[in-house]
Amino acid sequence: MDPESRRLFNVRKVQKGKKPQFKRTCSHKFKRLDDNWRRPRGSQGKQRRKYVSKGALVQVGYGSPAAVKGLHPSGYSDVLISSIAELELVDPSYEAIRIAGTIGAQKKALILAKAEEAGIKVLNSGRSE
């Protein structure tokens, strides 16, 4: 990983630490309302009017740097694999694989062996590295 990417990963880590938990308005009051974010649209809504005590609104400024957005903390791009044939499409220089949960133990062992042979990093191998 080059120094600029490493710096951007550190920036992302700091930004994620400062990011508030974006919660749905009044989700703590009603059991039927999930915490998942919904934009407040009421005409008199306190959260929409940006009252500090009512929680933060989702805004562009909370986002990660574009160069490292969506990347795994190891610096690799995450690729979901569900067959051995899909391994041939992976570029080990910037992509790492994650084996799908629907794969059985026997096929997973074959994929792990083939990935190790090709020098591809596996993110959910089940082994501590």
From Swiss-Prot:
GO terms for molecular function: structural constituent of ribosome. It comes from the Archaea. Disulfide bonds: none annotated. GO terms for biological process: translation. The keyword Ribonucleoprotein applies. InterPro entries: Ribosomal_eL32 (IPR001515), Ribosomal_eL32_arc (IPR023654), Ribosomal_eL32_CS (IPR018263), Ribosomal_eL32_sf (IPR036351). The keyword Metal-binding does not apply. GO terms for cellular component: cytosolic large ribosomal subunit. Keywords: Ribonucleoprotein, Ribosomal protein. Pfam families: Ribosomal_L32e (PF01655). Belongs to the eukaryotic ribosomal protein eL32 family. This is Large ribosomal subunit protein eL32. It comes from Methanosarcina acetivorans (strain ATCC 35395 / DSM 2834 / JCM 12185 / C2A). The gene is rpl32e.
